[in-house]
Amino acid sequence: MDNYEYIVASLPVLRPEDSRSDNVNAEALIAEIREQLSGRDQTVLDQLLAGYDDEQLTEDFYRQILRHKNRFLREWFRFDLDLRNATVGYLNHQLHRAPDHDKILLEEREVEEFPELEAAERILRGTDILQRERGLDELRWHKVDEITLLDYFDLETLLGYVAKLKIIDRWLQLDPDSGRALFRRMVEEIRTTYDNKKQNITI
């Protein structure tokens, strides 16, 4: 059995006080997490990471991932698909294209409410491109927190951290200051989460 508690506890001390962009390497942190997982869990992690390759984001990918046994993968990529479709839908409206142009619509998927739709559309209406990207990533960040809210020391917790590391990695490239700030934010969240959940378990 994987020692998820040990892995989670070790995350804050990997690079806890880094302040220079060349010292914050999200991909290296993900690789360190992966090395500590079992082969089965590595496969699940790889499926999460596949979702960051635009060439793999096909109907078949979403069809399979939305039926995955892992709860984090199912909920995360349901949100991801809805957010992508909302973004495409907004652009279609702005460009006077057909509403469903370039959307990924799964025929077998039941119509579901997208709770973040209003927030996403409000962000997309912004005129500052960087602020729009930051706003959408804030939605993603909060979704990770929502999905893993009741998780303790398990694979879902680690997948959530990796999803946040991917957000950090993107901002280290777009805006290094924002990337470093997000990294420090995640370190503090890990510390707080670990302390709180450890206390809850021992009570």
How does the language model describe each region?
Residues 1-203:
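Extended alpha-helical surfaces
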